[in-house]
């Protein structure tokens, strides 16, 4: 999440980095009341490796 935030800050302040609108919406407008913040990995075949950081599997995606 911290990395995504830093990428978005860089993308907003730079004219050379182009982030698609859907990417901005996904990173900046998460619905924390429904699921949580995405941890950046799926848990379709293996458990969340980011469980040590507090992530858990919900709907085949790791969330905090």
UniProtKB/Swiss-Prot annotation:
Propeptide at: 1-35
Please name the PROSITE patterns in this protein's record.
Answer: CYCLOTIDE (PS51052), CYCLOTIDE_BRACELET (PS60008)
Superkingdom classification of source = Eukaryota
InterPro entries, alphabetized: Cyclotide (IPR005535), Cyclotide_bracelet_CS (IPR012323), Cyclotide_sf (IPR036146)
SUPFAM superfamilies the UniProt entry points to: Cyclotides
User: Could you say which residues form the signal peptide?
Assistant: none
Keyword flag Disulfide bond: yes
Which Gene Ontology biological process is one annotated for this entry? defense response to Gram-negative bacterium
The tissues where this chain's protein is expressed are given as:
Expressed in fruit, pedicel, root and stem but not in leaf (at protein level).
Which UniProt keyword terms apply here?
Antibiotic, Antimicrobial, Cytolysis, Disulfide bond, Hemolysis, Knottin, Plant defense
Q: Does the keyword Transcription regulation apply?
A: no
Which cysteines are disulphide-bonded? 39-55, 43-57, 48-62
Q: What is known of its domains?
A: The presence of a 'disulfide through disulfide knot' structurally defines this protein as a knottin.
Protein family (similarity comment): Belongs to the cyclotide family. Bracelet subfamily.
> What does this chain do?
Probably participates in a plant defense mechanism. Active against E.coli ATTC25922 but not against S.aureus ATCC 12600 or S.epidermidis ATCC 14990. Has cytotoxic and hemolytic activity.
Give the protein name, as stated in the record: Chassatide C7
**Source organism:** Chassalia chartacea (Chassalia curviflora)
Source organism phylogeny: Eukaryota, Viridiplantae, Streptophyta, Embryophyta, Tracheophyta
